[in-house]
Amino acid sequence: MKLSDIADNAGSRKKRMRIGRGIGSGKGKTGGRGGKGQTARSGVRIKGFEGGQMPLHRRLPKRGFNNIFRVEFAEINLDRLQDAIDAGSIDAKSTVNAESLVKSGVVRRAKGGVRLLGRGEIKAKLTIEVHGASKSAIAAVEKAGGTVKILAPKKDEGEAA
């Protein structure tokens, strides 16, 4: 027996059906697509159409809206801030603000400002300037001997001052 003698068992691999190759092929003329019309053509799918049944996107009610005045804060928790201080990317002696957090890479971008949240604990005595802070975060920073200054909301660059 040689490697070239090895073959599949008869009927174990079925040949694929080539459609639209004459009536003798068994899948000629319309090629399994039924009669004429839109769905007999290539690439046709009517998006959202469910065969006449009321489509899902029309059965469900409209909900909510997009507030154009929404302000998105970059959120930072106390444990993340403490990790950055331990790693040396933030100087505990200088004021911690949005600019220093972005510069150190702790926050990616602070377009709407930074909001301080209270998960974890802080050991360093810090002076923090942020645009928002939770009560628990303020309490934890003050317990460690630091201060939190809440800044006024950031104005849009496009807005007249």
From Swiss-Prot:
GO cellular component: cytosolic large ribosomal subunit
Function recorded in the entry: Binds to the 23S rRNA.
The entry's keywords: Ribonucleoprotein, Ribosomal protein, RNA-binding, rRNA-binding
Residues covered by region (Disordered): 1-43
Protein name per UniProt: Large ribosomal subunit protein uL15
Gene Ontology biological process terms, A to Z: translation
Xref: InterPro entries: Ribosomal_uL15, Ribosomal_uL15/eL18, Ribosomal_uL15/eL18_sf, Ribosomal_uL15_bac-type, Ribosomal_uL15_CS
NCBIfam families: rplO_bact
Subunit description: Part of the 50S ribosomal subunit.
Domain of life of the source: Bacteria
Family: Belongs to the universal ribosomal protein uL15 family.
Database matches in HAMAP family: Ribosomal_uL15
Compositional bias ranges of the Gly residues kind: 21-37
An example Gene Ontology molecular-function term: structural constituent of ribosome
Pfam families registered for this protein in UniProt: Ribosomal_L27A (PF00828)
